[in-house]
Regions:
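Short, solvent-exposed turn/loop segments enriched in Gly/Ser/Thr/Pro and often Arg
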Residues: 27-31, 160, 190
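Amphipathic alpha-helical scaffolding segments comprising HEAT/armadillo-like alpha-solenoid repeats
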Residues: 116-124, 145-157, 175-187
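Structural detector for internal amphipathic alpha-helices that build alpha-solenoid repeat scaffolds
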Residues: 131-144, 162-176, 180-187, 192
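Short, contiguous acidic/charged loop-to-helix segments that flank catalytic cores in large enzymes
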Residues: 53-59, 89-93, 124-129, 158, ...
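Short alpha-helical
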Residues: 33, 147, 192
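Amphipathic, well-packed alpha-helical segments that form the structural scaffold of globular domains
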Residues: 7-10, 36, 153, 172, ...
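C-type cytochrome heme c attachment motif
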Residues: 101, 151, 170
Length: 192
């Protein structure tokens, strides 16, 4: 990042933001005061990336430090600042001197009201854009073990590669079924 100072990083798994960000890495860089996405495309045996700025400011106190995706697909950016970046002379250890902001990124014109009234199942949580929700779903499905095989099998046969990988991870943990699912994964048509 040149003179940058990379901090928070996450993969955007939502579909609320424009297509260019979907499935791509997001990264905070406090030095140049920017949150970027790094869309990648396949290139031979590897990948080629580009840089797309998501949130940038000339405000000298803007220091994006972390990024995450909310359950609705919006993105939260933590902007935390201390008196001397890097913590050499921290002046934000006392209430009243602490400084920071949280930004929520959503597309213009989209309803930004979030509701939790939607019924969430462990399986739907496993496909959530939010990492904490995915982990809760993973824990619940892992706990029931073999009873979740049928449900996880449907996700494993789906088209979305990330939920497929999560389903495979759980299926391969079921005692007695490890070889079945690892063998199926090795024969899978997706090279990734």
């Amino acid at each position: 990042t040149g003179q940058g100072s990379p901090t928070g990083i996450a993969i955007y798994e939502g579909d609320l933001l424009p297509k260019v960000f979907q499935g791509q890495m997001m990264h905070c860089d406090a030095g140049p005061r920017v949150v970027r996405a790094y869309p990648v495309t396949k290139s031979g045996a590897g990948y080629k990336g580009e840089i797309v700025n998501m949130l940038q400011s000339k405000d000298p106190w803007y220091r994006p430090s972390d990024v995450c995706t909310a359950p609705d697909g919006s993105v939260f950016v933590a902007d935390w600042h201390d008196g001397h970046v890097g913590g050499h002379h921290m002046t934000d250890h006392k209430p009243g001197q602490m400084t920071g902001r949280i930004y929520r990124l959503t597309p213009k014109g989209k309803n930004t009201q979030y509701t939790i009234s939607k019924k969430r199942t462990a399986l739907s949580m496993l496909s959530s854009p939010n990492m904490a929700a995915r982990y809760i779903g993973w824990q619940q499905l892992n706990k029931v073990g073999a009873k979740a095989e049928s449900t996880l099998g449907k996700l494993w046969k789906g088209d979305d590669q990330r939920p497929r990988a999560r389903a495979l991870h759980l299926l391969a943990r079921i005692k007695g079924l490890e070889k079945k699912y690892i063998g199926a994964a090795l024969k899978d048509a997706n090279p990734d």
